[in-house]
Amino acid sequence: MKQGSLYEALFQIGALIFVVIVVHATYVTVIRPNADLIQEQQQLLQQQDENFVPERSVFIILRDFEQETCIILMLWAIAIISMKTQHTLRERALLDRTLIQLQDGVSILPEDSRNYSRPVQALSSKEREFLLPRALLAGLHRFQSTENIQAVSSIVKDTCESEADRMETELTIVRYIAWAIPSIGFLGTVRGIGTALGQAYQAVSGDIVGVTQSLGVAFNSTFVALVVSILLMFLLHQLQLLQDRLVLDCQNYCDARLIRHMQVPEKNEKS
């Protein structure tokens, strides 16, 4: 588990550095030069024709630093979500395998727990860290030590619930990003409106170009931030749904293929 946590931390740091480099390079070489060129052309056409209505350009909408930051955070969060989705799908693949070898009509007795746990222990070290093997091994070990089926059910449930809590905690950084993106967009709105108010004297004299550009910064940053936030929250909820289903399916797997077949000898039940 410690190696997995270290890998995730290194992945997140590496993904952030990679995204920052790629997005900033794209802005410097593509988005901002094209936005400046389009804006100059629109200003020239407006000077020639007062009735000219400029078209909204994607480059102009995305050009400011607030939008760049929002896109960086979105791509970083998507990388984290993709990593966790891939890990969850690998865990789900174990649900299609028969880890407890049982013949029809055969019951699991406390003294048989060690034998039935061997196929699970034979899994690779990475697979043994998955939820399903941990829940199965915890149930078999508890059954061997307590000879109590209710105790097995409790330990399986506790294992699944603790895993659900861990998954919930590990998504904290993604939730923070989803909260931070609209906030950054509103910072752009405040900056744009503040700049527009500072140029109000130009509008009084008839020059409204500076004011309209500043208001464009305000509205574009909010627009991009809200769109990015909607997309990110959708992906986050899909991941949460996938993880919740994994926990429930693992618990059902243990109930159907392990606990249901357990049996305590009558002498132990009486004692």
Predicted regions and their residues:
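Cys/His-clustered metal-coordination modules, chiefly Zn-binding fingers
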Residues: E163
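Large intracellular
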Residues: K2-A9, I13, A25-C160, V264-S271
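Helix-termination/interfacial motifs at the ends of transmembrane alpha-helices
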Residues: M167-L236
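Juxtamembrane "helix exit" motif at the C-terminal ends of alpha-helical transmembrane segments
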Residues: V19-L37, K84, I184-V204
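Charged, alpha-helix-enriched surfaces in structured cytosolic catalytic cores
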Residues: C70-L73, E127, L131, E147, ...
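Membrane-spanning helices that line or support transport/gating and their immediate boundary helices
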Residues: T29, P33, I81-R92, A196-Q199, ...
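Lipid-exposed faces of alpha-helical membrane segments in multi-pass integral membrane proteins
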Residues: G14, F18, T69-S82, I184-L187, ...
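Channel- or pocket-lining gating/hinge segments that regulate access to a cavity or pore
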Residues: G4, S153, K157, G206-S271
